[in-house]
Amino acid sequence: MLHPQQMQEQQQQQQEAQAASIIPEHYEMEYIQRNNKTVSFCQIPISILGGAIAGVIGFSGVYGFLFYFFIYITFCSLFTLKENKNLHLYFPNPRSIWFDSIGAGLMPYILFWTFLYNIIHIY
């Protein structure tokens, strides 16, 4: 039979062991880079598709850029929901998905946005 204080200590040790198994203490740089590439490889086709949609619809000026931010926020939200809030297991800073790659998809977006806008609405 255990003393109540010993039982508390055992419970604390079990909780610490569970927390250690859930949250990694260190991250492998190779895996972090691979996870960032995966996010980037998903974001670029989404940006291309968003630029094509913006060009076909006929957005111009500020509305086109606002549409890009809408597409970007939608992608990040869906990616976060898909991972069921376990992003801390794959990224040291889960906010990096939201802020680090905001410019990565901007150039393909602008390319397809202006290309399809010019083809459909100008010519």
UniProtKB/Swiss-Prot annotation:
It is a multi-pass membrane protein. InterPro entries: Emc6, EMC6-like. The chain crosses the membrane at residues 42-57, 64-84, 103-119. GO terms for cellular component: EMC complex; endoplasmic reticulum membrane. GO terms for biological process: autophagosome assembly; protein insertion into ER membrane by stop-transfer membrane-anchor sequence; tail-anchored membrane protein insertion into ER membrane. Residues 58-63, 120-123 are lumenal. Its main location: endoplasmic reticulum. It is found in: Endoplasmic reticulum membrane. Pfam families: EMC6 (PF07019). Keywords: Endoplasmic reticulum, Membrane, Transmembrane, Transmembrane helix. Residues 1-41, 85-102 are cytoplasmic. Signal peptide: none annotated. Belongs to the EMC6 family. Component of the ER membrane protein complex (EMC). Part of the endoplasmic reticulum membrane protein complex (EMC) that enables the energy-independent insertion into endoplasmic reticulum membranes of newly synthesized membrane proteins. Preferentially accommodates proteins with transmembrane domains that are weakly hydrophobic or contain destabilizing features such as charged and aromatic residues. Involved in the cotranslational insertion of multi-pass membrane proteins in which stop-transfer membrane-anchor sequences become ER membrane spanning helices. This is ER membrane protein complex subunit 6. It comes from Dictyostelium discoideum.
